[in-house]
Structure formats: structure tokens, C-alpha cells
């Protein structure tokens, strides 16, 4: 199965359907202006409602002090009981609100691990190591090269040391070494940036889909940083590329019931023991696009931390399609059919369609939480017209999420996925730039890719106070998850450069770079 062709065929079918009938541009222009006016009307509805109150206040200004005193005495005389009851009710409701409201979750800072330059894996290096293992057939080597050339990956992604060696040495000790290098590197950086003492961390959530040793990765961190004995430690495995946001959501839920706490979230993936050494094409795509990386995020529910935090967590939305057999099996770790029974992750033909359904469900849930009222009314009106009144001539209205968010961090799972989301959400190249550049510079780093993308936006100086960022990722299960953040301050790239913990900061002037549709592998015999 040629996954690249599958994605291309899927995209071609989509383009064919979309271009089957040219749109009526006159109607499109009219709708555009109606929509814009509607947006301004709803957005300014508060001011329209306040206007009568202002007029009443202006009228009351003509009252004399004696008139106001008489009015007050009158109300006091005849409505003392009702006023007392109202005041008591107000105090009760205020107390109830402050005692039951959700705790605010702040992101103090985060750090992404940047491997040493000795671990850089060019496209030529990847093909050279794949050829040297002597397992892949010539056809499958050509298949991997074709995937790699169209993947959108650049020449500076990273591979673990064990797989760059000749011959490679994928073993448990090397896998542990990779995990420790990535996790500890990211954690050291975030602790240095925030100045938080490891003993103050009360919650630890680690996610890594394919590498789950005993003791666990979370236990490694507890041991390394000597975290306190009552730390709430969680290790999430097998949850795919969307597990990073699942970890954020879990930490959020725990912080609601653990007052004055810090939560450390660590997201990574392990390549050493998960390089597929077989000839099942459905499993070879993962070899070509997954690369080394990880991130550490420090959250807090302490009100005093707001002034030094970067972001506030506004929403998390989780979607799970696992009840459907096709969705459950579309990303599946199994043994291949060869005699050696090599283990790999198989990607099915309908992966893109299933991802699209999960994405649709997730954004449909998220939309009412974040979209302006004008967008919600337009969406609801077209939905009623189509479903209730059966007016099929009206096209489904796609809300403009650019009105809800300034920045988009879309999981860098592959070029075809990014192309589809860009088209379906009508995003610009500027909005897609963090995701595309992350895929180019670091490859698919699984659940941590969202943080490399946010770090890119910070290094570019794009994050301003009040900006809203949408992180969205999808992965095995099949799951699609979202997180919405609001910037609490403007991020100054010069300060990030002084800390030297942003993986982009020393080379951000080189980006964005052009990413051609095909990047030929110039040689398959490179040695290092």
C-alpha cells in the first residue's frame, strides 16, 4: 500500500468535488458583506444595550439632591424587606460563585528539546542507513525515498544515536538513553526558565505512545529530580500523537482539586525501538516522518503566578472515535506477515477520512465556546435551513475560525494533513507557517510538535498580550483534541534569546524557508 498515493488520491478526489461547479461570485461577495455587517452588529450589541441605560443616567442627572434623598427614603420605607432579601441573596450567590468556580490554570513556561548537531539526520543519511541494514527490498527502499521526498521534512531533523550507528543498535538501554536525554533536557530547560523547585511539583503527567518500560518514564523523572513522595504521577502510553493535549487536560482536571499546585507535563516519543525493520508498506510511512523530540510544560493554579505566566488555559475539548471499528483500527501496532514477525504501526487506507470526521466533531464542539455570536448565528441559520426546511440549495456554512484565534498550532503529522486542514479551515500561509516549518525543521515529533510550533511563533515575536492560540492534534484511537490558550503578556524574542531555551531562537532569522512539493534525495551512499 502506497500511503503517499492514497493521500494524493484522497486530495485529488476532494479537489474534483470542490471544483465540480464554479461558485456564484456575485452572491459570494454579497454574503461577505452581509456576514461582515452581521459580525459588527453582534460584536457591538453590548454597546447598543448600554445606550438606553446611558440615556436614563443622563436624565437622572437633572434630579436635585433633595429629590434623590426623598426617592431613597421612599424605597427604604416601602421596600426594606425586599432590599434585605435581595442583598442576602446577592451575598449568597457571590460566595457560591467564588467557592465553586473552576480554578484558573496558568502556563508558566515550556521548553522544547533541541538535540545535539551530531544527531542531525538528512534525507540522504536516512536513506543510507535504511539501505545499510540490508532488510528492505529495493522496491521498498524506492518507496521510502518517494515518501521522504514528498514529506516536507528538511535536512536538519534528528535521529537517535542508536539508529545513526553502522550497524544500528536498537536495544532497551539505548531506548532508555534516548528517553532520558530528551525528557531531562526539556525538563532542565523549563525548570531553569521558571525557577521552580522540583520539590514544589505536586503533579506529573508523562505521555509516550510506543515506549513504556518498567519502571515507567514518570518514575525515571521522579528518581532523577527527587520529586516528593506524595507527587501525583501518571504515565500515559499508546495514546498517539494527540496525547500531549490529553496530558494537558488531565493536568487541568487534577489542578482543579489540588490547590496551590504545580503540574509538570512531559510529552515525547521514542524512535530507537520503533524503527520498523520489515517490508509491510503500511508500516513504512512511520519510519520516514517520525523524528526525535520532546517538550516539558509547567502549569500552575496559583493566583500569584498569573503575573509571571505566559498563557492561561481557556478550553480543552477531547473527541474519541474509538467506538467505531474503522477508526479504532486505522492506526494499529501489530506484527507484520513476514517470517520474522516484525512489529510496526500500520496506517490504513481510510486514515485521512477518519481524521477528517474526528476533526469535524471536535471543531463542532469547540465552535460554540470560542466563535463570535455572528458566526454561530450564521452557522445555526444555515443548519436549520438545510435540516429543518430541507433547503438543499444552501451550502453548509463553515465558520471562520480566524475570528476566534490569532494563532494556529496544528499537529505536524504530515504534509497532506496540513494541506487538508489549511483548505478546509480557509487558513492563510501565515497561519500555517509554524506547523509547516516545524515539520520541515524537526519532522513529526508526535505529541510534542504543538510546542515546537508555539515556540516558533514566540521566536518570531508574533505572540501579543490577549492573543488566542488554538492547538489541535489527532492520533490513534482515533482521537482529536484541542486546547485554547490566551496570552497573558507579549512575548519578547530578545528575552527568549537570553534564556537560550527556545529551539528556534538562534536560527529563526532563516525561516520561513520554501518547501517544494518534491525534495529529491541527491545520494543514497552518504557515510558519517
From Swiss-Prot:
Pathway: Lipid metabolism; fatty acid biosynthesis. Inhibited by K3 herbicides such as allidochlor, anilofos, cafenstrole and flufenacet. Strongly inhibited by metazachlor. Gene3D superfamilies: 3.40.47.10. It is a multi-pass membrane protein. InterPro entries: 3-ktacl-CoA_syn, ACP_syn_III_C, FAE1_typ3_polyketide_synth, Thiolase-like. Its EC number is 2.3.1.199. Its main location: membrane. Keywords: Acyltransferase, Membrane, Transferase, Transmembrane, Transmembrane helix. GO terms for molecular function: fatty acid elongase activity. Disulfide bonds: none annotated. Pfam families: ACP_syn_III_C (PF08541), FAE1_CUT1_RppA (PF08392). The active site is at residues 241, 320, 407, 411, 444. Expressed in siliques, flowers and stems. In young seedlings, expressed in the central cylinder of primary roots, in emerging lateral roots and in their root cap, but not in aboveground tissues such as hypocotyls, cotyledons and leaves. Expressed in sepals in mature flowers and in the chalaza and micropyle region of developing seeds shortly prior to or just after the detachment from the funiculus. Expressed in roots, flowers, cauline leaves and siliques. One of its GO terms (biological process) is fatty acid biosynthetic process. Belongs to the thiolase-like superfamily. Chalcone/stilbene synthases family. Mediates the synthesis of VLCFAs from 22 to 26 carbons in length (e.g. C22, C24, C26). Involved in the elongation of C20 fatty acid suberin precursors. Functionally redundant with KCS20 in the two-carbon elongation of C22 fatty acids that is required for cuticular wax and root suberin biosynthesis. This is 3-ketoacyl-CoA synthase 2.
Amino acid at each position: 500500500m502506497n500511503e503517499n498515493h492514497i493521500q494524493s488520491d484522497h486530495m485529488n478526489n476532494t479537489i474534483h468535488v470542490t471544483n465540480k461547479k464554479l461558485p456564484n461570485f456575485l452572491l459570494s461577495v454579497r454574503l461577505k458583506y452581509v456576514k461582515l455587517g452581521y459580525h459588527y452588529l453582534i460584536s457591538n450589541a453590548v454597546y447598543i444595550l448600554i445606550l438606553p441605560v446611558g440615556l436614563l443616567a443622563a436624565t437622572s442627572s437633572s434630579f436635585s439632591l433633595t429629590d434623590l434623598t426623598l426617592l431613597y427614603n421612599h424605597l427604604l420605607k416601602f421596600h426594606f424587606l425586599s432590599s434585605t432579601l435581595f442583598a442576602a441573596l446577592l451575598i449568597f450567590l457571590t460566595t457560591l460563585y467564588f467557592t465553586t468556580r473552576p480554578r484558573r490554570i496558568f502556563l508558566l513556561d515550556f521548553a522544547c528539546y533541541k538535540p545535539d548537531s551530531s544527531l542531525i539526520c538528512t534525507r540522504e543519511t536516512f536513506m543510507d542507513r535504511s539501505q545499510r541494514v540490508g532488510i528492505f527490498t529495493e522496491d521498498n527502499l524506492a518507496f521510502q525515498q518517494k515518501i521522504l521526498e514528498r514529506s516536507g521534512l528538511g535536512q536538519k531533523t534528528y535521529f537517535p544515536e542508536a539508529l545513526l550507528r553502522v550497524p544500528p543498535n536498537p536495544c532497551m538501554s539505548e531506548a532508555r538513553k534516548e528517553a532520558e536525554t530528551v525528557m531531562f533536557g526539556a525538563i532542565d530547560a523549563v525548570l531553569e526558565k521558571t525557577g521552580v523547585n522540583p520539590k514544589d511539583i505536586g503533579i506529573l503527567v508523562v505521555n509516550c505512545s510506543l515506549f513504556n518500560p518498567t519502571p515507567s518514564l514518570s518514575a525515571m523523572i521522579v528518581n532523577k529530580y527527587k520529586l516528593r513522595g506524595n507527587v501525583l504521577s501518571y504515565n500515559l502510553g499508546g495514546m498517539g500523537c494527540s496525547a500531549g493535549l490529553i496530558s494537558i487536560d488531565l493536568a487541568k482536571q487534577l489542578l482543579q482539586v489540588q490547590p496551590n499546585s504545580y503540574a509538570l507535563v512531559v510529552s515525547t516519543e521514542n524512535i530507537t525501538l520503533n524503527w520498523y525493520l520489515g517490508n509491510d508498506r503500511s508500516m513504512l510511512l512511520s519510519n520516514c516522518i517520525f523524528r526525535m523530540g520532546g517538550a516539558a510544560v509547567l502549569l500552575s493554579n496559583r493566583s500569584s503566578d498569573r503575573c509571571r505566566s505566559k498563557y492561561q488555559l481557556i478550553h480543552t475539548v477531547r473527541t474519541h472515535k474509538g467506538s467505531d471499528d474503522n477508526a479504532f483500527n486505522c492506526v494499529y501496532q501489530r506484527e507484520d506477515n513476514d517470517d520474522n514477525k516484525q512489529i510496526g504501526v500500520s496506517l490504513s487506507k481510510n486514515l485521512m477520512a477518519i481524521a477528517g470526521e474526528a476533526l469535524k466533531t471536535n471543531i463542532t464542539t469547540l465552535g460554540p465556546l470560542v466563535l463570535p455570536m455572528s458566526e454561530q448565528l450564521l452557522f445555526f441559520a444555515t443548519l436549520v435551513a438545510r435540516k429543518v426546511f430541507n433547503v438543499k440549495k444552501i451550502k453548509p456554512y463553515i465558520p471562520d475560525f480566524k475570528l476566534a484565534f490569532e494563532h494556529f498550532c496544528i499537529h505536524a503529522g504530515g504534509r497532506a494533513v496540513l494541506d487538508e486542514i489549511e483548505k478546509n479551515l480557509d487558513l492563510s500561509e501565515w497561519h500555517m507557517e509554524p506547523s509547516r516549518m516545524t515539520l520541515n525543521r524537526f519532522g513529526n515529533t508526535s505529541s510534542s510538535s504543538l510546542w515546537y510550533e508555539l515556540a516558533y511563533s514566540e521566536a518570531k515575536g508574533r505572540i501579543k498580550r490577549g492573543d488566542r492560540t488554538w492547538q489541535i492534534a489527532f492520533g490513534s484511537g482515533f482521537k482529536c483534541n484541542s486546547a485554547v490558550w490566551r496570552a497573558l503578556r507579549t512575548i519578547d524574542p530578545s528575552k527568549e534569546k537570553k534564556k537560550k531555551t527556545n529551539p528556534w531562537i538562534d536560527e529563526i532569522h532563516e525561516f520561513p524557508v520554501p518547501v517544494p512539493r518534491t525534495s529529491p534525495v541527491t545520494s543514497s551512499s552518504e557515510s558519517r
